Design a protein with these regions (language model features):
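Charge-rich, low-hydrophobicity low-complexity segments
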Residues: 1-84, 90-92, 129-178
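Eukaryotic endomembrane contact-site and trafficking scaffolds
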Residues: 88, 108, 112-131, 142
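Compact, well-ordered interaction domains used in eukaryotic information-processing assemblies
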Residues: 96-97
Length: 178
């Protein structure tokens, strides 16, 4: 669509943010949106890097392309929008209304609170530990080429697992977590 193309053009014009240790962003407060590029194209699975987002506040992060794994630690009021993660997305310490939109084979959520919202497409049930006041919804982020990338990553169809999280702090077989 025209809107998606416009968004992609804006994203492409943004400055790439990374450092030498691994693709991602660290120690950022506010400022312009950050773009982290993963592997693109038909062979993305074999070239996909890990991505690390640490100690971020009050910013937007766009993960474009395919990543092998995603590790988020200590994010406050951060919005993360991303394409496919072939393995695990570990989301630890999301606070103050963080919003994460990600498609991943597995998602583990630790110590999320204060209105964190997770928009997920996963091939397994999300694991939740030591978290409260967290909302879940289906993955909705789009950009041109994302559909093909999701198919190649085995995440093309939404299995609905975003609504079936296992809260390890609430082991009750007959009642959903509060």
């Amino acid at each position: 669509s025209a809107a998606a193309s416009s968004v992609l053009a804006k994203i492409a014009a943004m400055e790439l943010h990374a450092d030498a240790s691994a693709p991602g962003a660290r120690d950022v407060v506010g400022g312009d949106p950050l773009v982290v590029r993963g592997a693109l194209g038909a062979d993305a699975a074999s070239a996909a890097p890990d991505c690390v987002l640490e100690r971020l506040a009050d910013c937007d992060v766009f993960l474009i392309g395919t990543f092998r794994a995603l590790r988020c630690h200590d994010l406050a009021n951060v919005r993360v929008f991303g394409g496919p993660v072939l393995g695990s997305a570990l989301l630890h310490g999301l606070t103050r209304g963080c919003r994460v939109e990600i498609a991943a084979a597995q998602c583990r959520v630790h110590d999320a609170r204060d209105g964190a919202a997770l928009y997920l497409r996963t091939s397994s049930r999300p694991i939740i530990e030591h978290s409260s006041d967290v909302a879940f919804a289906p993955f909705a982020f789009e950009y041109p080429g994302l559909g093909d990338a999701l198919e190649r990553a085995g995440l093309g169809a939404d299995a609905g697992t975003w609504r079936e999280g296992d809260d390890f702090g609430w082991i009750k077989t007959h009642r959903a977590s509060p």
